[in-house]
Amino acid sequence: MRCPSCGSLDTQVKDSRPTEDSSVIRRRRVCLTCNFRFTTFERVQLRELTVIKRNGRRVPFDRDKLVRSLQISLRKRPVETERLEKMVSTIVRELESSGEAEISSEMIGEIVMENLRQLDDVAYVRFASVYRNFREAKDFETVLGELSDEGLPTNVRK
């Protein structure tokens, strides 16, 4: 592993431990050249995924892009980072275990919306407004109507 401080490849693992849900291994490392300490995370990747965009272009799946888009939807919402990370892991696992190497962006969007709907209504509506390309207030009314029809609490779900 390359040291982020000096760029040396001469690093050593000082501590390894699984995260709470055991889907990721956290490693504390030290650079033997400059003594800089840093943390890395290791997770299992079942398969390389390719995303088929709406315009037909194919791009490699980017987990970080998924995290960023969810962080935007969840901004200023009472959802802990741990819950976000767990949801991302669940989504990625579902995509990887689908058996498909190529996955449409629409499929990813639907899976994300399904997970957000169970987690936080406000984040769900925010994500839906971008994903479904809302153009007018009526679009918001439709989604809000769907949520109230479910009869579920309209805040953060436990």
Curated annotation (Swiss-Prot):
Cofactor: Zn(2+)
Domain ATP-cone: 49-139
UniProt keyword annotations, A-Z: ATP-binding, DNA-binding, Metal-binding, Nucleotide-binding, Repressor, Transcription, Transcription regulation, Zinc, Zinc-finger
Annotated stretches, region: Disordered: 1-20
Cofactor note: Binds 1 zinc ion.
GO biological process, one term: negative regulation of DNA-templated transcription
GO MF annotation terms: ATP binding; DNA binding; zinc ion binding
One Pfam family this sequence matches: ATP-cone
Keyword Repressor: yes
Zinc finger (unnamed) residue numbers: 3-34
InterPro entries: ATP-cone_dom, NrdR-like_N, RNR_NrdR-like
Biological role stated in the UniProt entry: Negatively regulates transcription of bacterial ribonucleotide reductase nrd genes and operons by binding to NrdR-boxes.
Family as reported in the entry's similarity comment: Belongs to the NrdR family.
Protein name: Transcriptional repressor NrdR
Species of origin: Afipia carboxidovorans (strain ATCC 49405 / DSM 1227 / KCTC 32145 / OM5) (Oligotropha carboxidovorans)
Gene: nrdR
